[in-house]
Amino acid sequence: DVYKRQGHIQVRGFAGNFLVVVKALTYIMTLGREGIPEAAKNAVLNANYLMRRIQGTFEPAFDRICMHEFVLDLSGFKKETGVSALDVAKSLIDYGMHPPTMYFPLIVHEDLMFEPTETETKETLDEAIRVLGEIRQIAEKDAQSLHEAPHRTIIGRVDEVRAARQPVLKYAFND
């Protein structure tokens, strides 16, 4: 029964999330037959470049050639400095960078998963390498400042435990 209420038809169950399919098809058609393999090669190249250049600052969880993503194991770094993967991710926000996936996969306990896209330039990747090196230096000198990151955003570090236990899903406007 596709009719939920009088005059309303539910399409999602039939066609899935239609706009996701449209975006994927648009991307495929834009790249074309030659562009798709090239994009895949660029994603793999970017991930391996970033992983090898970060090595020494932070260690990869798996020291081998990766595909389009790689995981950094920060457990030794945390023991050494007291700075967690969460602290590093939040610190990246202060540099205008979107933080990577945190604490996934679950088989690595203090990890960050980086997935540089196929469109990232060498300059952008080099900037990420520089920033991660700077965060490493800050951690060795002033770990407390990283525990409080981000500093340059309107809202500072969110209490994630409180947010999960007492979610506020609407904004209270002052009338």
Where are these regions (language model features)?
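Short, small-residue-biased leader/transition segments that mark boundaries at the very start
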Residues: 2-3
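PLP-dependent aminotransferase class I/II
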Residues: 12-23
